[in-house]
């Protein structure tokens, strides 16, 4: 949704204006004005992209794009992300500890975790990298900030980024009940090789109690250093590298929600790209965190803890099911974020699209299932409103897609669109104009399902998903155009399928792989599928970026397909490892002027926007 939870305009509808007045597309984001990190960024004149383990600067301001500089990051960049603001870039890299051995330095560009975090730290490390873009021919890393933890997600508004990090406690060795189970006592009671469920449960309960006592003692003996994330800051702004290290958060900035939602530490860091990279002015909250959503005013982090009753077939149904806890942070200030409230909804969330703020309230779409029994599945749309430090549920509608799971969701203005699927695809329209009384007002049942929904005009939504049979068998990739101008009667106007039953697209689970260019009514998505050759009995892997023209009257028409050149086969290492080649996967599309650029790990290709004909190829160096 864009603006205030879905008000016009929508992200992607209105082109951005570059410094030279050239229209260009940015990252496909959920909220207008709230940037999301991605593996490629542009301002209409410059393109920053990850590929082959490097950051590449491509000048797109001239008649043809030109590679100006590449920066070796010493890290895998497949899931790397970044923000770009004026002459600074903030890179977000997931890394793992490198232990080269005593007295052996870590590889170039990697942190010696053994030196800084100790030999007992084996979890993930988040690396924030500040890059100076002033001289494209000589890109420079100004500073690195290494944090013990994993990136959950990030957002940026007007050059101020909020980075959400989840850090598990370190140096604490828990004991699971299975480690304390007295198998000798159990076998002495029932006999070797015999099974007795009642006796087993008795001994399991004893082990569970021992585990609780043991782990509580571990917690009681722990120190603050076990709970707070650690950091190493590397300043490369001038002369030899300067290092500092310590705890990322102060105790005064760590909060505890009124509901238990895990033992990890959530850190919300504030990094202003107009200033140098410091320690992030973090605020902490004891909680797990998996899903991040942000409006211009608030950032929400959601987590769905494991419920042990779901694995117990004898548990009371009232004890089963899932609960999602949502934590709210005020980000209106350009300075430190502020934790303000927490709330809960029944069920689990599909993705960030399951949350949307509108007129101060948070709408949440969720699916709940009791234990492993899928016949109990049911979906809900709930509305939470802040009251002090609580987010109270003020309205809810349930009964959506019974026995099914949410596969796609989008809130636009005062309406929610929820797709569930098991056999057919019900597209529900949910009226949330009265937040205290949300109501399902329309339903459309069709084969297949849409995993991603995107507004493409007044009363029109484009869906990207999978086709299917009436029996629920999923087939190839599908693009559908829906008319939702009448909430009570949504209609599928057009659909097209592409590929075969093995078809797949990154756009199914990552909206940033989807491009909508409203100016010409064109959408582009990456697609992959395999074909079986009966003559050779071999499978071939096909892939490319496909462009479609979308029109209410004319339907969905294929404009063309873009493919990248095959890389040169790898040189022979020996007779067993010779000539290995691979097909680059096209992952992103963006528009600048009358060109559409597609990105793979090996390069950028510029094609004509009108017909997707080849124009220019920029290969990334090895």
Q: What is each PLM-predicted segment?
A:
Residues 1-622:
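Beta-sheet-rich non-transmembrane sensory/scaffold domains
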